[in-house]
């Protein structure tokens, strides 16, 4: 009887003790897999495994401190963290697709200069309408004599004397004299034609127009060059020939002060037969160079000034550059030496800056980038200025 009572006491203990632990994991497992989902299935499987492992532990403190909601929150946070990378990639892709490079990477440009083609064309047309006097030369005088002699002829009226007859002739001229006269006439005509040809050649040389282009590429370290051109554009009077001569002189001096930064160069000289054709070529070169700017942020042309503050920040790399272009139209024929090194560049700048003021018809100085905080990359230098050759 005692044994039976002991059995009855142990049976409830063995039956009731594991009851809360066996029902809870079974109930959790059915709850987790009753509604399967794509993204949360693996997470719930991990929770169930951890729950089973924690319940299999023999430590009562771990079982009492277990919080399934905390584990769920941790797994949800991990899932959100894993979704952040694709979301960031999608955002970056959208920015790249809708990104406008010209909105922030606009290359600024400066332009300063002017021209006096209209006044020169009027003066040349008025001078061409003037008449040129022919030089006087001594002409040989041809002498002639009028001799009267009585003429006797038959008369139907029986009279013998009719009247005096007047005859003209070269007195005492022989064939040798005629040769001398012809030679003198040839000398006279040839001298007259030579004088006219010399006058025509002088007039043609005066009307010829030389259009000069000098382009220099510099390292971006020469930021003081931009400051020089900015001050020149803000203070110069570009509506007078004196002001244009001053701009040309100061531009050549600014390049001469930075020989160590000059790395490439290009030059060309076009001689046109008239002022009109020279003006056309000058305007063509100016528009071509201005088209390489995304925006002209500083302009002073014929004393018409304009300024804009749109710039882009320099990236700070060492491969940033500055390009300066000098365009000039001058009366007559002018030439620049071939440029193969810094010495040749210095000689060309000196010759360009020493052209007389009364010969200058037009000057334009263009530089990019205009702002000191702007940048011109190596790729832009090679694409926009392919004619530059290293010094």
UniProtKB/Swiss-Prot annotation:
Main location: plastid
Disruption phenotype: Normal green leaves under continuous-light conditions. Delayed non-photochemical quenching (NPQ) relaxation during induction of photosynthesis at moderate light intensity. Higher NPQ during the high light period under fluctuating light conditions leading to pale green leaves. The double mutant missing DLDG1 and FLAP1 (dldg1 flap1) has a pale-green phenotype similar to the dldlg1 simple mutant in continuous light, but a lighter pale-green aspect in fluctuating light and higher NPQ than in flap1 single mutant under short-day condition.
Region (Disordered): 116-140
Alphabetical UniProt keywords: Chloroplast, Membrane, Plastid, Thylakoid, Transit peptide, Transmembrane, Transmembrane helix
InterPro entries membership: DUF1517, FLAP_modulator
Transmembrane segments: 87-107, 168-188, 321-341
Extent of the transit peptide: 1-48
Subcellular location: Plastid, Chloroplast thylakoid membrane; Plastid, Chloroplast membrane; Plastid, Chloroplast envelope
Record GO biological process: nonphotochemical quenching; photosynthetic acclimation; response to light stimulus
Low complexity bias spans: 116-138
Entry membrane topology: Multi-pass membrane protein
A GO CC term attached to the entry: chloroplast
Taxonomic superkingdom: Eukaryota
Function recorded in the entry: Monitors proton H(+) homeostasis in chloroplasts to manipulate luminal acidification levels appropriately to balance photoprotection and photochemical processes. Required during acclimation response to fluctuating light (e.g. photosynthetic activity optimization) by controlling non-photochemical quenching (NPQ); acts independently from DLDG1.
Family: Belongs to the FLAP family.
Designated name of the protein: FLUCTUATING-LIGHT-ACCLIMATION protein 1, chloroplastic
Species, as recorded: Arabidopsis thaliana
